[in-house]
């Protein structure tokens, strides 16, 4: 990992990279992901990059963090509100950014099976979209701002079937 405590740290980290031409996964967990995401945006803008052209994912999955890593910083309602804040901000200002990276792999690491991983991931994604809908956003605006990070175990055929089923279930849900 990398220790990032300030906007200056981010500027030093990304200073030589064309951050507007790649996809950057900011793999931070819990509430820290939103704070570090804001620092990343500020650093990129100070380096002359437009936030609307940045592409990547910010993690920001408090449900996955709670279930997979047992990280509970604030009450769940406050964490869901913060995730909805990030989702709304990204929909309005950063259309190429995945506001919430639903971490099914976090839960899988906690001991659940592939079926439960899909169920928990879809339920979490629905909760995040509902947060956007409560703010007046449309599902077609929210859905592209949600990404999924799923585990891949040793049973190859089961994992392929899981991913195919998850895609179909997500499409039907939307």
Model regions: which residues?
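Active-site loop/helix belt of alpha/beta enzymes
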Residues: 163-167
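Catalytic alpha/beta active-site cores
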Residues: 1-158
């Amino acid at each position: 990992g990398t220790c990032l405590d300030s906007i200056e740290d981010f500027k030093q980290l990304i200073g030589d990279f064309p951050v507007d031409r790649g996809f950057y996964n900011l793999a931070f967990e819990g509430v820290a992901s939103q704070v570090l995401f804001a620092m990343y945006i500020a650093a990129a803008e100070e380096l002359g990059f437009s936030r609307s052209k940045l592409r990547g994912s910010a993690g920001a999955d408090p449900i996955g963090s709670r279930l997979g890593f047992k990280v509970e910083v604030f009450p769940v309602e406050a964490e869901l509100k913060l995730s909805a804040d990030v989702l709304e901000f990204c929909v309005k200002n950063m259309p190429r950014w995945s506001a919430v990276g639903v971490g099914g792999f976090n839960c899988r690491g906690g001991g659940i099976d592939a079926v439960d991983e899909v169920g928990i991931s879809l339920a979490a994604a629905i909760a995040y979209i509902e947060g956007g809908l409560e703010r007046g956003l449309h599902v077609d605006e929210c859905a592209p701002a949600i990404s999924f990070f799923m585990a891949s175990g040793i049973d190859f055929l089961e994992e392929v079937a899981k991913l195919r089923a998850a895609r179909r279930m997500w499409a039907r849900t939307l």
